[in-house]
Amino acid sequence: TIEAEENQTLLEKLNREELINTMQFLQRCAAQAGYYYNLQAPGSEFGTMKLQTAENDDPIVAQVKIWDNKEHKIRTRFSLRRLVTEEDGSLSVKLPCGSYEAEVTCGPEYSTVLVPFEITKDKVTTIKARLARIAHLTDHGWTAGDLHHHSIYSSPAYGGTDPVIETPGQVCRSMKSLGMQFGALSDHHNVLNHEEWQRQNNNFTPIISKEISTSNGH
């Protein structure tokens, strides 16, 4: 078909490095959607982990790092998954069966919570993480933010070159999970993110911007 011929033509145009970059981009897209694979363990059995984070009784956006306990403790090398909860503090991810540990954080103003858990075939494991505030930096005149970040609008899907798959909303939650109160989303050569970025104003100050890159660099 025409579509198949177009795909074949695209593959023929890609060199080795471009093909690898494309495969890595697609792998990140799958990971963002909660799908993972392990080439060394085909046919692995999976279960689901559901997490709820809170400060006191209020949900909080948090960063969650997950690693395999066995790999971490025995082999000294491990596969780390870095995820971010939704605005309501929830997270759901499918994982191969086994023993894991989750590290839940929300920047330097909050405690770090470590939660061990087990994944069983076709079962849902529910865990909770209550974060305690240990500092109030804004009381001392300090605020945190990121003035250089990109979203999917800088990716090949929109004519860019950066292997980024996060939407503006996901970028905002990522910043908030690190304890930031403001941020600039500076995609390359376009303002496609501006409308969506300006809506990310729940306990956050979005700054619209654009990055111009020339043949000589930034």
Please place each PLM-identified region on the residue numbering:
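A short, solvent-exposed beta-strand micro-motif common in secreted/extracellular proteins
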Residues: 97-107
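A metal-dependent hydrolase metal-coordination microenvironment
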Residues: 135-218
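Surface-exposed loops/turns
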Residues: 96-97, 121
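A short, amphipathic beta-strand motif
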Residues: 47-56, 64, 129
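Structured interaction patches on ligand/partner-binding surfaces of diverse proteins
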Residues: 83-87, 108-126
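Extracellular beta-sheet/turn segments enriched in Thr/Pro/Gly and aliphatic residues
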Residues: 26, 32-42, 118-137
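A general sequence property marking short-to-moderate contiguous segments
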Residues: 6-39
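Short, acidic Ser/Thr/Gly-rich low-complexity loop/linker segments typical of extracellular
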Residues: 63-95
